[in-house]
Each structure stands twice: as structure tokens, then as C-alpha cells.
Amino acid sequence: MSRGLIVICGATATGKTALALEIAQSLNSIIISADSRQVYREFDIGTAKPTPAEQDLIPHYLIDICDPRETLTLAEYQEKAQSLIDKNLTNFPLLVGGTGLYIKSIVKGLKIPRVAPQPRLRFQLEALGQQQCYQILQQVDTISSQKIHPNDQVRTLRALEVFYVTGIPISQQQGENPPTYPIVQIGLDCSTEELKRRIEIRTKKMLEMGFVEEVEKLVKKYGWELPLFKTLGYAEILNYLQGKLSLSEAEREIILHTRQFAKRQRTWFRAYPEIEWFDTTSPDLVENVFSKLTETLGLLN
């Protein structure tokens, strides 16, 4: 019996959702989100979640599964996603998104320490500041410190958290156990100028859809200190609401920071030779992707 996983990845604003909907409808399959912010409820416009209408077309999973005050670990994401994949392999489920580590955890079968978040420990570590935390990491887990950027607070805290809970460096608890089922990885890309244009259009559309109002509502409900408010788009709108930026300045900053983020995503995904790349602007995109899927997974046109 034919079975396999279809991955659609690439930088933000490259059309992953639209392509995924086309393929999933043709295969009568499901879409599993691989986006680290779309897991959170109420953070909708700024995370470019599929619209309710799009979600009505095809079953979507791992969207709106967490309270914004919660933290979803990579291990928890991997467990949830892998369970969905295993149950739907014969329908060729689609894993879709731009969070490279989420996708890597599945396609590489990453071995991830099952250490639950430790709020008190994190609070104590955060009080030390990122610079001191990174210095501690260099002492207790040199290997991890060489892989983690000095300014990457999330990964630094996680590495220290695992070390203090288990007594073993996270680098010694990691490895890979790739799945045995077939996987086709489809990457979407376009020229830098086209991506810039798409990001500008998307940002304007978000603002027109009520992005500012979304953030105002979230601040009223949760206060100003949610970690998610430090992420792309939300941080800039928060600065606008606090009078630090005009709305046009916030828009320009969102566009700039999104372009920088997209560049990092491109660099990440380009490092994996198994990804088959397609020009998202091609009028034959869907046909070309289906040809690849048919060739690799034995799908019937």
C-alpha cells in the first residue's frame, strides 16, 4: 500500500498554505502545521494562520492547541505531529510551515530530551540575563554553546533547563532516528525582489485585517509581558501602542524584520539537499509539484 509524508517548507510569504490546500484537496488528506506560533490561540493575524474558511476546506492540525501563556516544547510538538502522521500515512499527510526545527524533528527523527518546562528555574535563569546564562552554558555544555547563538535566549534557557533537571548536557541526549516511511520535501522560493514585494503586501494586508486591534485585545487580556509579544510583528505593534513608533514606522519595521527572518529561513532550508525546490511564481507550480509527488510516492494523477 502506498504511503508517505509530504513536507511543504520555505520562507514566509512564499505561498505554502495555498499550495498545501491544493494538494490536500486533491488527495483528500490533512494538513499538519509546522509553525511555532500558530500553535497558540488568539494569535491569528500576526502569525498568518490559515483563515477559518481555509481550515473548513481541509482538516488542519496543531493550530490553536495552546494557551498563549503556555510553552510548547519541541518534544511535545514532535510527539503530537508524529502521532498524526502515523495515523494518516496512507492518506499522504502534509506537514506545512516555516519552522525549520519542527520539520527537522520529524524528517530526521530527532531524539529530544523529554524534560517539561520548569517555570521557577526559567525565572531564576532569566533574572541572570542572557549574557550570563550563555556563559554558564559554555561551562556546562560546550558543544551546545558552539551551536547556539549568544543572543538566542530560547535555546540557551532550554539547554540549561535540561542540564539542571537531568544533570546531563542536552548535547549528550540528542541524536537522530529517521523514519522509515517515504518523505518528499517540497521547498518554495522566489527571487529576493519578489519575496520583498510579497512581504510588503502581506504586512499591509495584516494591518487592514485588524492586526493592531488584535494586539490591543491581547494586551487587555494578558498584559504586556507575554513572551509572544517579543516575536515578529507583535513586538513592533506593541511599540506602536506604547508610543515608541508611529504606525507607518511600525509597518516599515515589520517589513524589514520579516525580510531578515525570511533570509534566515532560506539559509536554514537551503542547507538540506533532500529538499526539492520550486519557483512559487511559476504558473505550472501545482502541476510540477504533482509530477514530483507522482514520481516519488507513486501517486495517481
Curated annotation (Swiss-Prot):
Q: Write down the EC number.
A: 2.5.1.75
Q: Where is this region: Interaction with substrate tRNA?
A: 35-38
Positions with a binding annotation for substrate: 12-17
Residues reported in the UniProt entry to bind ATP: 10-17
Tell me what reaction this enzyme catalyses. adenosine(37) in tRNA + dimethylallyl diphosphate = N(6)-dimethylallyladenosine(37) in tRNA + diphosphate
| A molecular-function term among this protein's GO annotations | tRNA dimethylallyltransferase activity
Q: Which UniProt keywords apply?
A: ATP-binding, Magnesium, Nucleotide-binding, Transferase, tRNA processing
Q: Does the keyword Transferase apply?
A: yes
Record-linked InterPro entries: Dimethylallyltransferase, IPT, P-loop_NTPase
Residue numbers marked as site, Interaction with substrate tRNA: 99
Enzyme class of the recorded protein, top EC level: transferase
**Is the keyword Cell cycle assigned to this protein?**
no
Q: What are the GO BP annotations of this UniProt entry?
A: tRNA modification
Taxonomically, the superkingdom here is Bacteria
What cofactors are annotated for this protein? Mg(2+)
**What do we know about how this protein assembles, alone or with others?**
Monomer.
Q: What does this protein do?
A: Catalyzes the transfer of a dimethylallyl group onto the adenine at position 37 in tRNAs that read codons beginning with uridine, leading to the formation of N6-(dimethylallyl)adenosine (i(6)A).
User: What family is it from?
Assistant: Belongs to the IPP transferase family.
Q: In its UniProt entry, what is this protein called?
A: tRNA dimethylallyltransferase
Which species expresses this protein natively?
Crocosphaera subtropica (strain ATCC 51142 / BH68) (Cyanothece sp. (strain ATCC 51142))
Q: Which gene encodes it?
A: miaA
